[in-house]
Amino acid sequence: MKPIHTIHRRESKQIFVGNVAIGGDAPISVQSMTNTKTTDVKATLKQISEIEEAGADLVRVSIPTMEAARAFKVIKEQVTIPLIADIHFDYKIALEVAKYGADCLRINPGNIGRVDYISEVVASAKDHDIPIRIGVNAGSLEKYLQKKYTRPTPEAMVESALRHIDILDKLNFDNFKISLKASEIFMTVFAYQQLSSQIDNPLHLGITEAGSLSFGTVKSSIGLGLLLSKGIGDTIRVSLASDPVDEVRVAFNILKSLNLRQKGVNLIACPSCSRQKFDVIKVVSELESRFKDIITPIDVSVIGCVVNGPGEAKSVSVGLTGGDPNLLYLDGKTHSKIINENLVNELEAQVRNSLKNL
């Protein structure tokens, strides 16, 4: 399906997290974060594998203690997907995981401490040729900013980011990306808009603490969608109180909806009504489950009646229109009649067969 609008992305420098390019002309990457105890190596490895299988490009791992840092070393030795070490409060943990092969160090300006601590982290990042993410969060701004602004604001977040960018500039370090996250959509959007016009470093997008799978998906889609539609953003993480695999799927659905990155089946389906000639909701649910393993982009339509079915089918690889009889379309042309009992199996078979020709 040919998009009617192309988003022109903001020009930015390019950095690498492991073998994944961030910024420049690289595709917008997707990441998630483990929620296991990092010291539980087996559980963390299992979750990293699940996140990777869902299609994530990067995985972030929380390193709250030196014990977790030592566990990270064991974990890093057993995975190939780039790992980002999430560091708060203790800069020495960042120094440790850099030695253990972290592909990126995430530090929080609000709690990492003094400039000399940051200087040591930067020196370590230089030694190991790894980038840093300056991760500004509205909920953990520096105390002087809390006093100055009295409450979190986009301006406070941008000031925090610019202060730390200045520190890195003075240390001759430009291998970094920035994030400005809040749980409130417009605070996040305004902060990114303000900062993006002042710097050309890659931007990591996210609505932090977005909430449950249902509500958090809506908040993240609106917030990230507003920014991405304006060309802002080089890597994204959807933060949900849910399985990290859900974060990956939602992130790709956001990118897919904006035609920024295609992955897997783009399933176009009607909401159904009394005109439907088969159970649209049941068929779509079953197909979504069966299509989870598909990575190659392909457009598929499932429409319950002839009002919009034929029209939608003309612009997809595989289309189904409800009727008497139901009609299956391939590449916009009528292919065959299909009875309700065979809908899911036949449609899946045709999709997988069409993938061979893409």
Swiss-Prot record:
Family affiliation: Belongs to the IspG family.
Keyword list, A-Z: 4Fe-4S, Iron, Iron-sulfur, Isoprene biosynthesis, Metal-binding, Oxidoreductase
Cofactor annotation comment: Binds 1 [4Fe-4S] cluster.
Cross-referenced InterPro entries: Dihydropteroate_synth-like_sf (IPR011005), IspG_bac (IPR016425), IspG_bac-typ (IPR004588), NO2/SO3_Rdtase_4Fe4S_sf (IPR045854)
Listed name of the protein: 4-hydroxy-3-methylbut-2-en-1-yl diphosphate synthase (flavodoxin)
GO terms of biological process kind: isopentenyl diphosphate biosynthetic process, methylerythritol 4-phosphate pathway; terpenoid biosynthetic process
Swiss-Prot/TrEMBL cofactor(s): [4Fe-4S] cluster
Enzyme superclass (EC): oxidoreductase
Keyword Ribosomal protein: no
